[in-house]
Structures are given as C-alpha cells and as structure tokens.
C-alpha cells in the first residue's frame, strides 16, 4: 500500500490549533489544488467530541466559504479527520496559511453567533446521516478554544519524518 502524505509528518511534534499545507497538486488543466490540515487538537493528547465535531462540520464548511472563497480560491470540501483532531480542507487556489488562519478564526466567531440548534444547516433526517448526533454547546466550546489559543502554522519541513524513521515504523 502506498504511504499517504499525511503519514509522513511527525504527529508528536504538531502544534494545535494550526494550519498546515498538507498537499499541493494541479488538475489536468493546470489549476492549483491545495489540501490544508486544519489541526484543532494536539494529536494523541486531545480529541474533538463526536457531537461537537459533527455540528462543527455542518457550520464550519459554510462559514469558511464565506471568509475564504473569492476570485482566486474556491473551497471544494471540508471534512473531519477520522482521528477527530481536525479537518481537511481541499480547495482550488493557493492561499497562504495566514489567510486560511484568519478565515478559520472568523468562522469560529460565526459559530459562536449560532445560538439555536434549530439553525444548524441540514440538521434533519433527509440531509444528515446521523441528524440526532449534534451538540451546539460542544461546537461552541471548540470555537471558544480555537479563539482563545489563536491559530498557528505547522510547516512540513519541521514535521517531516526522516526516511530511516519511516522505514522502521
């Protein structure tokens, strides 16, 4: 099985909350695609609660589009990581980490403005696979924690696992 890019970085040295360019590539027509690691929690030390991350998934994707999409950027998808320590964001364009961090912080402010669980988008059995597994309170706690800590930057060069270490794992 090929080694995926996300497993070539040292998770024991990741900071959170932090933005990291996880991958860059081009479409067959030459358009740039960037995948960002939006790390909410320090790996193997913290984990996002399932109801909170699910609610955040419904809110975060729209709010990030409000703050980041423009003439040079279009978000394709934002999805939670299986390890529940953050989200992956795939987009067309090459915004720098500072721009993504600012959009992320603004999106967290927007999450805090949602005060009624009934206002969570797509919160129904027709549009959500587990529509009863939500917690606006947990989403608010996550947003407050991000804003309290501020969003930093993780750099691949600083997190790269040496080839001898990768070979031994």
From Swiss-Prot:
GO molecular function, one term: iron ion binding
Cofactors demanded by this protein: Fe cation
Protein's UniProt keywords contain Iron: yes
Database matches in Gene3D superfamilies: S-ribosylhomocysteinase (LuxS)
Catalytic activity: S-(5-deoxy-D-ribos-5-yl)-L-homocysteine = (S)-4,5-dihydroxypentane-2,3-dione + L-homocysteine
GO BP: any one term: quorum sensing
EC number in record: 4.4.1.21
Top enzyme category: lyase
Keyword Kinase: no
Binding-site list for Fe cation: 54, 58, 128
Record note on cofactor: Binds 1 Fe cation per subunit.
Keyword set, alphabetical order: Autoinducer synthesis, Iron, Lyase, Metal-binding, Quorum sensing
Domain of life: Bacteria
HAMAP family referenced in this protein's UniProt entry, alphabetically: LuxS
Family: Belongs to the LuxS family.
Quaternary state and interactors: Homodimer.
Functional summary from the UniProt entry: Involved in the synthesis of autoinducer 2 (AI-2) which is secreted by bacteria and is used to communicate both the cell density and the metabolic potential of the environment. The regulation of gene expression in response to changes in cell density is called quorum sensing. Catalyzes the transformation of S-ribosylhomocysteine (RHC) to homocysteine (HC) and 4,5-dihydroxy-2,3-pentadione (DPD).
Protein name per Swiss-Prot or TrEMBL: S-ribosylhomocysteine lyase
